[in-house]
Structures are given as structure tokens and as C-alpha cells.
């Protein structure tokens, strides 16, 4: 029964606006399966900030490291419960000041509802550093991300979350239908709205 539930949830989460799958299960020796701790031999750096949250299906993350570094590799990965996916960020999301600091402010990354943790693989001066961030969930039930919110609730087995999403989505659809019917039935009102949008 549990496998059937997982298969159904997997099918459900692959539908809707998030029609994409992770890169696949990583092999035993690959970076995505390394422990969530720093592998640097000399802790010559200081982590000042490492935060992330999900806002209606979009991942936001920010953080900073201070230390004397002249080169770096910034490699963020999404962890989908043992399945890793590389996240692609813009160059202006990362700010590097040689010899001083490395800061990142990643915005609007699409993640699937089965997202668990953000793993940051940093290579600073040849030392490999792993940072882990468990995102805070911020939900706006009135947003257009109703499908993502429903999928998230199904994956986490949070039926209250699913119920609230359905309630607010039903209200939005009802108001939209009432508006369309109200405007199209009354010709004078319809002409008034047309003049409003044309002007």
C-alpha cells in the first residue's frame, strides 16, 4: 500500500505546472551523497548567513562566507530525498570580493513539491565545503500556485494544507465566474468595462 501511495504521489507531482524531473539518482561516489558538513581541513572561513525559504513553489536562498579567498566554485543542488538536481543560478546572484567574502542571493528558482533541502557545494581555495539549508515554507493560498500547494500537501500528507488550497481556489473560480456572468449579462455594465479597459 505504501509503494502504491508513493507511485500515486509521484505521478501527481509530475503533473501541472512543474512538468520536469530531477537529474536522476546519483551514484555512490558522487558529490550529492557526501555528508552535510564541511570537509575543509583548515577552517579559515566564517559562515555569516545561510537561509532559504520556498514561496509558492519558488526557492529563495541567501548567505555569505567571510575569509581570505581568491577563487571559488558555487554549486547549489536540490535534494529530493536521495535524488539530486543541479540548480542553475544567474551570475549576478553571486557576489565575490577576492580576499574578503562570498555572498549569494538566489531568487525565483523552480523546485518540485518533493523538495527537502538545499545543498550548497562550495570549493574555496581547493577546500570543499558543504552547507545545508532546510527551507521555511511560506504559503499564499490566494496566489496562482494552487497546483504546487496541492502537490506539496499531498507529498507531506498535510491534508489541512490541501483543504485550504482547494477552498481558496474554489473561491477564486467562483468569483471569476460570477464576474464574467455579471458583466456579460448586463450589456450596459459590459460596455462600461470595455470602455474602462480600452481607455
UniProtKB/Swiss-Prot annotation:
Positions annotated as glycosylated: 68
SUPFAM superfamilies assigned: E set domains
Compartments, as annotated in UniProt: Host endoplasmic reticulum membrane
UniProtKB keywords: Disulfide bond, Early protein, Glycoprotein, Host endoplasmic reticulum, Host membrane, Host-virus interaction, Immunoglobulin domain, Membrane, Signal, Transmembrane, Transmembrane helix, Viral immunoevasion
Spans traversing the lipid bilayer: 162-182
Residue ranges, Cytoplasmic side: 183-199
Disulfide bonds: 52-133
Topological domains annotated Lumenal: 1-161
Domain Ig-like H-type: 43-137
InterPro entries associated with the record: Herpes_US2/US3 (IPR009237), Ig_E-set (IPR014756)
GO cellular component terms listed in the entry, alphabetical order: host cell endoplasmic reticulum membrane; membrane
Membrane topology label: Single-pass type I membrane protein
The family this protein is said to belong to: Belongs to the cytomegalovirus US2 family.
Function: Participates in the inhibition of the host immune response. Early protein that redirects newly synthesized major histocompatibility complex (MHC) class I heavy chains via the SEC61 translocon to the cytosol where they undergo proteasome-dependent destruction. In consequence, infected cells are masked for immune recognition by cytotoxic T lymphocytes. Seems so far to be specific for HLA-A, HLA-B, and HFE loci products. Does not interact with HLA-DR or HLA-DM.
Domain notes: The lumenal domain allows tight interaction with class I molecules encoded by the HLA-A locus.
Assembly and interaction partners: Monomer. Interacts with host TRAM1.
Name this protein carries in UniProt: Unique short US2 glycoprotein
Native organism: Human cytomegalovirus (strain AD169) (HHV-5)
